[in-house]
Amino acid sequence: MIPLDFLEKVEVFKELDDKQLTTVQTLCQEVGFARGERIFETGETPKYLWVVLEGEVALQWELPGRSALPETTISILRPQKTFGWSSLVPPYKYRLSAYCGTRTCKLIKVEREGLTGLFETDPATGYKVMTRLLAIVGARFLSLQDEIAKRRGSDIMNQW
């Protein structure tokens, strides 16, 4: 069972009290992956929200019919970080692929069905989690915008 001490530090669960965390804990399962192993693929219908327990996860943009490359890595996630938010937001399709980026990765998978069921029976928990999730997605979007601006600026400078 995933310790409550860890769950309370997870970015998406930080606002939850012990009772709410205990309920979330029942939906969690620890799984392991090896370096380079795919956790999920772009376009798949998500069944889980994921949390990094140990190791690193690389989120990569994949072109259809091509293998993942380091250059297509959008983000590296470390312990306590959440990914797979598409499991909670329509149209419920993963936007990126996820790979284990270290020798081994230990992850927590949180059942989407159980989590959405919890949100229906306990709207306060749902509100707290979705508010945190929105903040996380927003911050990642801003980070991506900054990276695109840097690259475009560099391209413009190189054309002079």
Locate each region found by the language model.
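Cyclic nucleotide-binding regulatory module and flanking cytosolic helices
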Residues: M1-E30, A34-R35
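Short loop/turn microsegments at loop-to-beta-strand junctions
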Residues: C28, P46-K47
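Glycine- and acidic-residue-biased ligand/ion/polar-headgroup-sensing regions
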Residues: G36, K47-P64, P79-K81
